[in-house]
């Protein structure tokens, strides 16, 4: 059974433009995969704690030596990772905040990137272990920054780092420029959704 994991990060939650685009993709995907499952994670409604020394040490402490608190931290991270492991398709809705991704997404990524779990170090460099998945990323921005912006590069690099290299990024830019620019950008993004699904 095919499974899609939808991750939204907008502070406006379901009303954010990136969330709306991700939801449209998920809905269209569900319509074309009636036997499939859609799981959702809202990082604003349920923010992941920021990585601190105690959490990092929990990840690197050998399993047999972990305290009860450390086991709880690792179990939480394992559950986040398992959602991705079970998914065939990841859909991310990501607005631009201060030229980067929302801090909630960065905190989430910090709990996903685990050596020996989602990636491993090799003599040739790091190797992602979550292979064979597709990611569709909707990035929304108030102005125009282009597809080669560092925000886009970061998202693509992180997904590749954990093994997800089949990545489609859809930008909707100029959303704060004016009504005409916003509708044009969102219309183009919706058209791209129909092509991708």
Residue ranges of predicted features:
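N-terminal beta1-alpha1-beta2 submodule of the flavodoxin-like/Rossmannoid cofactor-binding fold
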Residues: 1-94, 100-110, 114, 191-197
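Glycine-rich phosphate/pyrophosphate-binding loop and the adjoining helix
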Residues: 146-197
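Short glycine-rich anion-binding loops that position phosphate/pyrophosphate groups of nucleotides
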Residues: 96-99, 141-143
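Short, structured loop/turn "capping" segments at alpha-beta junctions
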Residues: 115, 119, 165-166
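Short, glycine-/small-residue-rich phosphate/pyrophosphate-handling segment
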Residues: 121-164
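Flexible, glycine-rich phosphate/dinucleotide-binding loops
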Residues: 13, 47, 144, 176-178
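Hydrophobic/aromatic beta-strand patches that form the interior of the parallel beta-sheet core
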Residues: 5, 39-41, 136-138, 168-170
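Cofactor-binding loop segments of dinucleotide-utilizing enzymes, especially the Rossmann-like FAD-
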Residues: 9, 140-142, 172
């Amino acid at each position: 059974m095919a499974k899609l994991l939808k991750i939204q990060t907008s502070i406006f939650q379901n009303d954010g433009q990136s969330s709306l685009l991700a939801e449209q993709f998920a809905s269209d995907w569900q319509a074309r995969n009636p036997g499939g499952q859609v799981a959702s994670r809202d990082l604003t409604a349920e923010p992941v704690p920021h990585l601190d020394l105690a959490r990092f040490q929990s990840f690197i402490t050998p399993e047999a030596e972990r305290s009860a608190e450390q086991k709880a931290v690792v179990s939480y991270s394992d559950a986040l990772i398992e959602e991705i492991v079970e998914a065939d398709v990841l859909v991310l809705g990501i607005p631009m905040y201060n030229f980067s991704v929302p801090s909630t997404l960065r905190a989430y990524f910090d709990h996903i990137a685990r050596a020996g779990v989602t990636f491993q170090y090799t003599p040739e460099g790091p190797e992602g272990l979550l292979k064979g998945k597709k990611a569709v990323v909707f990035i929304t921005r108030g102005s125009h920054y282009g597809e080669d912006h560092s925000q886009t590069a970061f998202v693509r690099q992180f997904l590749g780092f954990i093994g997800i290299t089949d990545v489609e990024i859809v930008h909707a830019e100029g959303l704060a420029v004016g009504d005409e620019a916003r509708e044009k950008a969102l219309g183009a993004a919706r058209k791209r959704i129909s092509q991708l699904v």
